[in-house]
Amino acid sequence: MTLDVWQHIRQEAKELAENEPMLASFFHSTILKHQNLGGALSYLLANKLANPIMPAISLREIIEEAYQSNPSIIDCAACDIQAVRHRDPAVELWSTPLLYLKGFHAIQSYRITHYLWNQNRKSLALYLQNQISVAFDVDIHPAAKIGHGIMFDHATGIVVGETSVIENDVSILQGVTLGGTGKESGDRHPKVREGVMIGAGAKILGNIEVGKYAKIGANSVVLNPVPEYATAAGVPARIVSQDKAAKPAFDMNQYFIGIDDGMNLNI
């Protein structure tokens, strides 16, 4: 799939450069001069995260080291591009996430910090975590575990804590927090299972599970586990519906039934 995604991106870049000569050099430097998705991605991320202390050339060496040691990182990036292309109606081109979407950039940058964290290069991982937060306004701890097929839509203000888990095929909108409940240590953050959609501004706090294909309504505060296929909404959140045919991360349907008809999560 990675090669197919890259071929789509290159073809689009050629057409875009022809149609908008003012951006021809931009499309050349970001896509057309590179041989593969990894090359383009390392160039883009290095330039977005660079500063006077850590120039782009040094960052690119770090990123390419991660790709060479763990090529699956690039495969995950291709899955993420496909997820955004298929789920976001505003995204008409395969190249859009790679070029313009900071949610995608933040996730791919996190994957480098996660590699470094697992290599026990924790100081560098934390340094880059801060740079990601500054550049993209997304704060993902390097130790968090995130799968593939992930979409951070708009992404501004997303926070993912140290012991959080986000499984494959999850969609998360802006302003979401996967956080702890206080000063406790150890395993203290949410576990988000596959196919979940989390609406804008939702807060999920503590070591609780959000079951597969669940939906969290916008601005909800979730303090208790959410069953599979359930929709939870409100402050504090309650179960308002359950549909075993739903695929919320793919459908991206923000609607849910009235919360007055819901039941308390403690039931």
Curated annotation (Swiss-Prot):
Catalytic activity as recorded in UniProt: L-serine + acetyl-CoA = O-acetyl-L-serine + CoA
Locations listed in the record: Cytoplasm
Superkingdom in the source lineage: Bacteria
InterPro entries in the record: Hexapep, Hexapep_transf_CS, LbH_SAT, Ser_AcTrfase_N, Ser_AcTrfase_N_sf, Ser_O-AcTrfase, Serine_acetyltransferase, Trimer_LpxA-like_sf
Matching Pfam families: Hexapep, SATase_N
Pathways involved: Amino-acid biosynthesis; L-cysteine biosynthesis; L-cysteine from L-serine: step 1/2
Gene Ontology biological-process annotations: cysteine biosynthetic process from serine
Keyword list, A-Z: Acyltransferase, Amino-acid biosynthesis, Cysteine biosynthesis, Cytoplasm, Repeat, Transferase
UniProt-listed Enzyme Commission number(s): 2.3.1.30
Record keyword Cytoplasm present: yes
Chief subcellular location: cytoplasm
Family named by the database record: Belongs to the transferase hexapeptide repeat family.
Entry protein name: Serine acetyltransferase
